[in-house]
Curated annotation (Swiss-Prot):
Signal peptide residues on this chain, from the entry's feature table: 1-20
Cytoplasmic membrane side: 57-92
The species this protein was found in: Mus musculus (Mouse)
Residues found modified as Phosphothreonine: T79
Protein name: Phospholemman
Record text on subunit structure and interactions: Homotetramer. Monomer. Regulatory subunit of the sodium/potassium-transporting ATPase (NKA) which is composed of a catalytic alpha subunit, a non-catalytic beta subunit and an additional regulatory subunit. The monomeric form associates with NKA while the oligomeric form does not. Interacts with the catalytic alpha-1 subunit ATP1A1. Also interacts with the catalytic alpha-2 and alpha-3 subunits ATP1A2 and ATP1A3. Very little interaction with the catalytic alpha subunits ATP1A1, ATP1A2 or ATP1A3 when phosphorylated at Ser-83. Interacts with the non-catalytic beta-1 subunit ATP1B1.
Family designation: Belongs to the FXYD family.
């Protein structure tokens, strides 16, 4: 028959093997920075190319604050010096 020492050694071996095979819960504070970096660079690259395409397509224009051009310059247009001349000629 087996001695109590052999049985104890067998139990210790079985317990150590059982604890080694037990699935470990993933640590919630361990992050995969490589995948996060690759994903971020991919999204940044796509947004960069999309921005360049929008700029080069000339379809995205400022719709507000545009006036129809009639060919005559507006009174507000021109240099600062010409606007001073207009104001001084009105006072006389």
């Amino acid at each position: 028959m087996a001695s109590p020492g052999h049985i104890l050694a067998l139990c210790v071996c079985l317990l150590s093997m059982a604890s080694a095979e037990a699935p470990q819960e993933p640590d919630p504070f361990t992050y995969d920075y490589h995948t996060l970096r690759i994903g971020g660079l991919t999204i940044a690259g796509i947004l960069f190319i999309l921005g360049i395409l929008i700029i080069l397509s000339k379809r995205c224009r400022c719709k507000f604050n545009q006036q129809q051009r009639t060919g005559e310059p507006d009174e507000e247009e021109g240099t600062f010096r010409s606007s001073i001349r207009r104001l001084s000629s009105r006072r006389r």
